[in-house]
Amino acid sequence: VKRNYLPLKTTVKVSTQTQLPLHLVITHPQYRFVDLFAGIGGFRIALEKLGGRCSGYSEIDKQAIQVYQQNFISYLNSDEIAFGDVSKISNLPDNLDLIVGGVPCQPWSVAGCLRGFEDPRGKLWFDVIKLVQKSQPKSFIFENVSGLASPRNRENLELIIDELTSCGYQVYWQLLNAYDFGLPQNRERVFIVGIRKNIDNYERFKFPLPLGIHPKVLDILEDIKNIQPVKKVKLSADTLFNGFVPPSRTRFQKEDELNDFFIFSDLRNGHTTIHSWDIIKTTERQKSICLALLKLRRSKKYGEKDGHPVAFSTFLEIIPDLKIEELNQLVSLGICWQTTAGKYEFINSKNMTGINGIYRIILPTADIIPTLTATGAKDYIATISITATHPQEYKQLFLKKIYKPKKFREITPQDARKLQGFPDNFIYHPQSAIAKKQFGNAVPITVVQAVARNLLEIILPN
């Protein structure tokens, strides 16, 4: 019987069988590795596919350990070492070929406020470096969020690389995106690879090139079928962006096509932005007042950062005939609120919090899903597709055919499993929120496999 859930239980027990192919456990391994910050085993799946055997793993999250043991620990390897807290490991097994790990990324992410080494989790890098120095494996692969390579954190990245280099390694790093390795997810991560300098050809390592395989979101959706691919109409920048293309657009957002997602936000005004005044019944006059607030609250004239509540007198600069009663009507409608200073601001005034619990609805015909995160973005997937020839028509079709009839659903653990490249027989946590958090913390398996394959060609030439 195929299982995709964990048995409900209160204690962690070792399974008497593993859901992964048993030959991965009982055949002679080609190399040995240790799995630090193991999570639910993304690194391990990739490395076992390439003939490796795990000599031990380190993880402190009890729910992640439960999932990890359910999938990887059986009577055949029940003596495998569980190291626990990385900061408390004194010794690793001798003669390791490889150490891997997704060092906690929150200190370097936007969600973690980019605190870096100021965050205790950021200091775990030094524990990792000490283990590399002491155990001297042939090589290592570490993964982290792209924020570690941002200009703000570049000095920290260089410090990490310098410290690892001083341990006797040639160190390489590169940003790699899961989309380039056969997964329909925009997930860019830093990969840091080191090879001990007494290994032959250590200087010849190269990061893998993109595979050129690009499945669509539809390919990973098990419950949404019979949707034909959409041929998008080419439109001018004037039509889409009023002549100015926002610099924040990603490589997946084409400058001559309609977006394949809709953002719910009162803070921006893109061609697929849904505002609260699009959802709540409002007059054209009320809509124009809301757009005026959107513009004024972002003006540098009132401060360096955007998000400034706007006074009635400021509104009069661009709407001279505005009545204060009109602003108070928007307060009554639940679109705005009035501060203690008598200024006006949107109720939905935080970026990425969305409206009515929704931040983004992605069309099933999209090329990618945005990055899965441990914190869980308020993203949904539409269950039908739409197409249009003009932004306004597109927006109205979305509201009429998808939003109002609720033709959308949450991203499920099954979706997350496929977006990260985990196999179909992987047993994930029975609670959806926990499972999605764990997949959001995981590494994309196809990327690890591609990096590891190139590394193994150096450290295992035979």
Q: How should these model regions be labeled?
A:
Residues 41, 62, 104-106, 146-147, ...:
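Short, solvent-exposed loop/turn segments at secondary-structure junctions
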Residues 33, 57, 81-82, 171-173, ...:
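Conserved beta-strand scaffold positions in the cores of enzyme catalytic domains, especially
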Residues 71, 207-210, 386-389:
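Short Gly/aromatic-enriched secondary-structure transition segments
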